[in-house]
């Protein structure tokens, strides 16, 4: 194998030094082989050094600044350079250390060289400097001929691009091999790039395994670069991952915006009806809403929490809906305000969480001394007051009590006691620390029953615009429902009114939120549910969606009856989807008319016939051929033998067909009753048997006919 660099060097020597004798050329080429070997080793080592510097991995190969094991003959150079006493590797590494000529010093060298005016406006990269190429030339040439600066610059640029290409190919090849770089892989890259596989040729530490007369091949060594391709990428997501928009405000407009907010809130809440309507319309369409939305929401939270008035709450809800409908308020960054607003709105719907009292059911007399009850007041006790020294000194007492009360936990006992009692095992902590929940400090009193619908409308509108507010409202409602149903036997009218408020709030939040109420359905007895609760549950039929909801449908239909029909939109949606699918997939109607074989000729007029043959009667048109002339092999059927045509069948679509006689495989005896019954004809008597065969006709069009049972009235869950 011969290197392209070697051939180019020989061509340059031949072209620029034509006066040199062949003898000196041969002697120089013999010593230049080892020097080219060193040059290729330098290129490979330098390329691997750049690869390690760029990728941050382990260097593929690096040589010390002062090599001590160079198996090459150093050729003395002409004293045209200050580094004439160094060989190839000494010069390259020494210049690289000085930062002016080497591979690593290409950035600074580009500015210091004569080519800095051309490279000054370009981005600097690590590469060869023209003076480095000049050093290479001086070490491989024994004459005083010097290369021009333009030739050195062009060679430096080409060599840098070649090294960059090799490094990039090594990285790509190693990525496909799991991040492992080997000599074999790099040699494969060099082979594909038309460069001799010389990596590691000057490293005498390795065992040489082959020598083809020009190059040495060494045993393979593995270097790990998997850390480069298997890095852990840390993506820092902010706390508020929602898509948000911020409307910046200049300082000189702050006073005007404050006055705008104050005037808008005053007019919408405390003015007459005409001014309230004008303020709401202004809030709906003002382009400044993106800048003042957070301030308005904060004021509404304060008014709803501290002004416990129903008419004022109605006006606040109305203003909130108008501001939320404004397009500039969408996706506004106001999570802290929504956090407090959700607590206030849910408190107005279902009362504050602390006001929900779980009923205290007295246990049986035999259980009073052995079962630890979770009273409502225990939630307010400090953790240091929960220590029981007797329990700490004798931890086996609770274990014995647990064993004594185990039979009470079976399904045969009352489920109510199973819910409100908790046995403390010895594995549990004696003073468990409950997880601190981040809850809002705002609260409000529940509004009247007549305002629940408008409140649910407000919650649904705000939640549909903000996913964060939707999640907060759903969490707060679920938290209150869990506490309400904890050990409670729902039987009073007040309890069902509370459930009605919760259901209406969940329906306002959507299908996903309402399905959180389904587990609590099993805790309600259908016979005890009053008639006033069923109308509030009827709108939930909107969320019915197929066979999976059949039990929920039956439960709702049992109590709601015909009131459920207006909300069964699943039927209409399914029918609309079916009709749309048929319309989209409908084909253009095409009629099939089957061809009838026969001989047909157009009727010519007398004038046309006269113009065709003229006065020559031999050219006159011949008469139409008959059917027998057109089809000489045609045999007309004998209608006398077709006795089946005389039998009239009364079955639609059926016609009589003669059954062909079958040859009897078993000969019948002459006195056989079957042969006598069939007229003595044996198997030939079966020709009198007729069967009815229906002739199926294909439709005339390709338009599919749908059965009428697939209409709207026939759809069912």
From Swiss-Prot:
InterPro entries reported in the protein's UniProt record: TAF6
UniProt-listed GO biological process terms: positive regulation of transcription by RNA polymerase II; RNA polymerase II preinitiation complex assembly
Stretch list, region Sufficient for interaction with Taf9: 123-204
Gene Ontology terms, MF aspect: protein heterodimerization activity; RNA polymerase II general transcription initiation factor activity; transcription coactivator activity
GO CC terms in record: nucleus; SAGA complex; SAGA-type complex; SLIK (SAGA-like) complex; transcription factor TFIID complex
Subcellular location: Nucleus; Chromosome
Keyword annotations: Chromosome, Nucleus, Transcription, Transcription regulation
Function, in words: Component of the transcription regulatory complex SAGA, a multiprotein complex that activates transcription by remodeling chromatin and mediating histone acetylation and deubiquitination. The SAGA complex predominantly acetylates histone H3. Involved in SAGA complex coactivator function but not essential for SAGA complex assembly, histone-modifying activity or chromosomal recruitment. Required for oogenesis; involved in transcriptional activation.
Family, similarity comment: Belongs to the TAF6 family.
Subunit structure: Component of the Spt-Ada-Gcn5 acetyltransferase (SAGA) complex consisting of wda/Taf5L, Saf6, Taf9, Taf10b, Taf12, Ada1, Spt3, Spt7, Spt20, Sf3b3, Sf3b5, Nipped-A/Tra1, a histone acetyltransferase (HAT) module made up of Gcn5, Ada2b (Isoform B), Ada3 and Sgf29, and a deubiquitinase (DUB) module made up of not/nonstop, Sgf11 and e(y)2 tethered to SAGA by Atxn7; not essential for SAGA complex assembly, histone-modifying activity or chromosomal recruitment. Interacts (via N-terminal histone-fold domain) with Taf9 (via N-terminal histone-fold domain); the interaction is probably direct.
Protein name: SAGA factor-like TAF6
Lineage summary: Eukaryota, Metazoa, Ecdysozoa, Arthropoda, Hexapoda
